[in-house]
Amino acid sequence: MNLCWQKSIYD
């Protein structure tokens, strides 16, 4: 799971 891109979406 890539929290990097997920964080960008949620941010």
From Swiss-Prot:
Disruption phenotype: Reduced nodule number after inoculation with Sinorhizobium meliloti SM2011; remaining nodules are abnormally spherical and contain a few small rod-shaped bacteroids, their development is impaired. Bacteroids development is arrested at stage II-III. Disulfide bonds: none annotated. Keywords: Nodulation. Pfam families: ENOD40. The keyword Nucleotide-binding does not apply. InterPro entries: ENOD40. It comes from the Eukaryota. The keyword Iron-sulfur does not apply. GO terms for biological process: nodulation; organ induction; response to symbiotic bacterium. Modulates the action of auxin, and may function as plant growth regulator that alters phytohormone responses. During symbiosis with Sinorhizobium meliloti SM2011, involved in nodule initiation and essential for bacteroid development during nodulation. This is Early nodulin-40-2. It comes from Medicago truncatula.
